[in-house]
Amino acid sequence: MRALLRSLLLLLACIAFGARADDAGPPQKEYVPKSGTGRVVVVVSGQTGASNYTSISQDFADAGYYTVLVDGNDLWIKGGGGNALLQGVIARAQASPHAVAGKVGVVCFSLGGAVGLTYATRLPDQVATVVAMYPLTNFIKDPVDFVGKIKVPVLMLAGTADTYHSCCVIEKARELADAAKANPDVAPLFVLHEYPGADHGFNMNTSHQRALVADSRDRAIAQLRQYLVDH
């Protein structure tokens, strides 16, 4: 009886420890598809916070994906560690009863785009594809070296008039695209779609460029449908 009691106490301690470990990760809000289950899509917000990306997260859920939204500020942190945090977000999402097993899609915006491009694109065992909208790229000093580390399909959506804090300019996006084209291993994986005259945040419902809200959403969903099938 005492041995059984000790085993029970040990089990409870392990469960409590696991719960604390889960709680230690960045907060993530879930959006459940109408079917109740779906392949996982992780949405990483820009610097303005997760609240500005609730609408598009719901759009992904409406498209049939179990979607979790995280704040990019929690993952793009000084001193590193964001890679492990992102993998923790993915693992928790995959452990949900609403998740269908398989690799995940990552959709990221602005600051969150740096998370997606730097970390998610290098996780081929966990990530099927990355969609990066107006991603932060001004930290990239060597485009050739950077894109050489990409291991999963990437769709980058960028506006040609994006001058927001000089974080996400089209010139750097084009440098990355050119570097990808010159690398035979990466060329099939990297697609840059430009929106002429578009500025930052073109996907938001507050955007004055209303047509781009739907177009960017539809392109993201098409990318997810293409790669969240056999992975």
Locate the predicted segments by residue.
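The serine-hydrolase catalytic nucleophile loop
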Residues: 48-57, 72, 168
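Conserved alpha/beta-hydrolase
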Residues: 61-77
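Short beta-strand/loop motif that positions the catalytic acidic residue
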Residues: 150, 156-158
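C-terminal catalytic histidine-bearing segment of alpha/beta-hydrolase fold enzymes
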Residues: 185-231
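Alpha/beta-hydrolase active-site loop
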Residues: 77-97, 220
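Short beta-strand element of the alpha/beta-hydrolase
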Residues: 37-46
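Primarily recognizes the serine-hydrolase "nucleophile elbow" in alpha/beta-hydrolase
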Residues: 51, 88-149
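Active-site-adjacent alpha-helix of alpha/beta-hydrolase-fold enzymes
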Residues: 61-62, 160-191, 198, 206
